[in-house]
Amino acid sequence: MPFIAFNKAFDPAAPDDLRINTAAVLYVEASRPDLIGQTTIHLLGQGVVVNAVTESIGLVVSEIGDLVAATRHYLAPPPAEGASTVYICPANVSYVRPNLPALPDFWVVRFVDGSELRVVAPLPLGL
């Protein structure tokens, strides 16, 4: 279980490291414009608490590795900037089920800690 470090985003900015166990990552996504940091990291057991870091989504995804890209599904209309891409760690997925006959089709990804995420159909390779 390798640990990797990122710069935690604070308001106001402060130099600090966030060291994460890559085996504990559920998914990552680019931070919304109204949040601090460039990337948001969701970890096992944290519920709605997230970790915002200053590094770009591309760097975070490449550092963690073995993530599967999917488009997030929103029950409400997507944000003005469009639907976000989430990068999911398949090792921490309990199961994936379709939410049919909903239109547009989407999948519910259930993680081993009981949290869930909805992604747009079709389901990406690797899940």
Which functions belong to the PLM regions below?
Residues M1-L127:
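Acidic, Ser/Thr- and proline-rich intrinsically disordered linker/docking segments
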